[in-house]
Design a protein with these regions (language model features):
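Glycine- and aromatic-enriched membrane alpha-helices
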Residues: 1-416
Length: 416
């Protein structure tokens, strides 16, 4: 075991933890003020649920070497038997417990991403139950299939590359968000009102915390304080910067002015796009990934939602699902064995196999997310009854109806 690597990965785990409150602020700033508390709560509560589930059975189901390609076994329930001195794999330089702590933070933020799609119209108790079953049915199996020993999609399977969560985190949550918002239906005034962002500074602060945590998210996935971690750190920043610029350019073309919300959203889109390939693609490719991910997400947000008629309230699918798919495919275009020996060369180097593996992995991830979300929705409806809030509660705002709180109370206890 290497003490430097242990300290580095634990620090990165703390960075990733910050992403969840950062997401709460990012989402909370985007909604109307009557839904701020509820929107932030639907991210924050998952810190509690996600960590407890991970310790009790999540890590075991995700990473225990079960011998099958789909899910782990129960040998590490309650983290019993998870070593403090031996690695998850024979060549690991960090203890199994440290690896578990790092992955735990991924399991927390992933279901939180989904909640943005249904902001302002889903009962809190239903989100609570849905999150539990989604983690069980979608996230843990996918984590095992992509990153676990003998997993269907990873190095022991079809060979799809996912350095830090393109499939496991972004595509799974983004596609699930799309399915859930379609099942739940549109907000009552979706096509008749102009939704105004209530607090732009909060959005910027949230996006900044997300990017701060994302450096640990991607660099930490090298699982060592080495050159690969440095490379992933740099590709992360480069892609985010390029994506911010290209989103601003899209804003200028469409609206004649750059916007602060656009710059913040573009930065997040670039972070999503580079996640699957951060430790596999050259630095120049990170620029291309960032520059192209923003326009793809921008088109989905500006035109795709209207064209296909779904109400993805805070663009969880349009940003994370679309950006994750695009980034995953471009990983198959630009991946380079010289950067990471575990990767195959991509299309630009004249080889097709890696791109094919990426496409197959993305396709399987989408199927799992769609089917799993349908199952989770059915279970949630069975256990909680009606999932959507009543029209009166939706009009009044979920802060009061679901939590009895207001983010901005006036002297008489009501929103000003």
């Amino acid at each position: 075991m290497d003490s430097g690597n242990i300290g580095f990965v634990l620090l990165c785990a703390a960075f990733v933890f910050v992403m969840t409150p950062g997401l709460a602020m990012f989402y909370g700033g985007l909604v109307r003020k009557k839904n701020v508390v509820n929107t932030m709560m639907t991210s924050i509560f998952i810190i509690g649920v996600g960590i407890v589930m991970w310790v009790l059975f999540g890590y075991s189901l995700s990473f225990a070497p079960s011998g099958n390609a789909f899910i782990g076994d129960f040998r590490w329930l309650g983290l019993e038997g998870v070593s403090l001195t031996e690695g998850y794999t024979d060549d690991a330089s960090i203890p199994n417990m440290v690896f578990s702590a790092f992955q735990m933070m991924f399991a927390v933020i992933t279901p939180a991403l989904i909640t943005g799609a249904v902001a302002g119209r889903m009962k809190f108790k239903s989100i609570f139950v849905f999150t539990i079953f989604w983690s069980l049915i979608v996230y843990y199996p996918l984590a095992h299939m992509v990153w676990g020993q003998g997993g269907l999609l990873g190095a022991d399977g079809i060979g799809a590359l996912d350095f830090a969560g393109g499939d496991v985190v972004h595509i799974s949550s983004g596609v699930s968000a799309l399915v859930l918002c379609i099942l739940l239906g549109k907000r009552h005034d979706y096509e008749h009102s102009i939704y105004r962002i209530h607090n732009i500074p909060t959005v910027v602060l949230g996006a900044s915390l997300l990017m701060f945590g994302w450096f640990g998210f991607n660099a930490g996935s090298a699982l060592a304080a080495d050159g690969l971690a440095a490379h992933a750190f740099m590709t992360t920043g480069v892609s985010a910067a390029a994506a911010m610029l290209s989103w601003m350019f899209c804003d200028i073309i469409k609206n004649k002015k750059p916007t602060l919300i656009g710059a913040s959203t573009g930065m997040v889109a670039g972070l999503v796009g580079i996640t699957p390939g951060a430790g596999f693609v050259p630095m120049w490719a990170a620029v291309i990934i960032g520059l192209t991910t923003s326009p793809v997400c921008y088109i989905m947000i500006s035109y795709g939602k209207k064209k296909f008629g779904f109400d993805d309230a805070l663009d969880a699918f349009s940003c994370h699902g679309t950006g994750g798919i695009w980034g995953g495919l471009l990983t198959g275009v630009f991946s380079c064995t010289a950067i990471n020996s575990s990767a195959g060369n991509g299309l630009v180097y004249g080889e097709f196999a890696q791109f094919g593996a990426q496409a197959a992995g993305i396709g399987i991830t989408i199927v799992i997310a769609v089917v799993g979300t349908l199952i989770c929705y059915g279970i949630t409806r069975l256990l909680t009854g009606k999932i959507r809030v009543d029209l009166r509660d939706e009009l009044m705002g979920l802060d009061v109806s679901q939590h009895g709180e207001s983010a901005y109370p006036s002297f008489n206890g009501l929103d000003n």
